[in-house]
Each structure stands twice: as structure tokens, then as C-alpha cells.
């Protein structure tokens, strides 16, 4: 995708809204409705189904996005024993959730269709429907979560909302409300990956 848009809006919106696109594709093809663990992990039954990565190339003087590479990796056919013991506790696959195989080409085609719709919405500035659906699917909202910093520190907070820039609005134990951004912290449930 050659977006020619500002880095902050394009990269962040695309990364998080692509998670919505993946959820839509899985729902349409497989009949199951994934949730989203903030910031961009599609989940089923409290376990990670998919990983999403973004790579940006910026124009030097204007910091406008020249290229945006989308990386989406879905666990399609893994059985529990295919995962390492550590990953087995937090990951799942479509075959585990459905009990039968899923056509990879059909899933890839459905994801491409949804990403095409996303790119058209992004170009038209129509972010509202993706943000609303993201909020609806976000499994963290209304729950107490652990905010883990890259340095190993962290704190607990109540996840309240997703702001217009896809930041996670939280209430700390002292009552202070703040917004955390992707890259600043990672989020885990108190008792597992999402719970």
C-alpha cells in the first residue's frame, strides 16, 4: 500500500483497523466472532489467534508514508501439541476453535477483500466505523488489566475506553485516568492472556 498519508494516522489506524479486518474475514468465512486484545491481537476463547505487524517507509522531509507493508499471521491448522508449552497457554488456532480444517486460500482471499475495504476507508478518511467496531470487539474494556512496560515494570488499571487515536484509556488504582499508547505498554489480563 502506498498511502502518501501522515505517519501517525496511517500507521496506527492501519495496524489496529487491520485487526478488525481480520476479525471480519474470520467471522464471515468461519462463523466464529474473534475479539480483540488491545492493541491488535485477534483472540478466540481468550487465546491469541493472530499476529499483526506493520513496517513503514517514510519520506524524509515530510514524514509522509511512502510504503506500508502489512504482515498478518493467522494460526490456521495448529494443534495444541504444535505450540511450545509456553505458547500453548496463550495461543489457539482456527482448527482448534472449529474442530475442522479451514481453506487457507479462501481465508487469504477474504482477508485481502477486507484489507482492500480498509484501504478505501482510510483513503476516504472514514475511520469511524472501524473505531466503533474495534471498541465493540475489544475484550479488555470494562476489565482490570496489567499494563506491562518494556523495562519489566508495570501496574494494574481498569480499561475504560478506546480513544479516537486507538489509545487505551485506563483508570489507575489512585483514580487517575490516563491514555496509554501502543508501544508504551503491553496489556495482559490479571489471570491470563486476556482475562
Task: Give a label for each model feature.
Residues 1-6:
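Interfacial segments of multi-pass membrane proteins
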Residues 7-9, 16-34, 44-195:
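Long, positively charged amphipathic alpha-helical accessory segments at protein N-termini or as interdomain linkers
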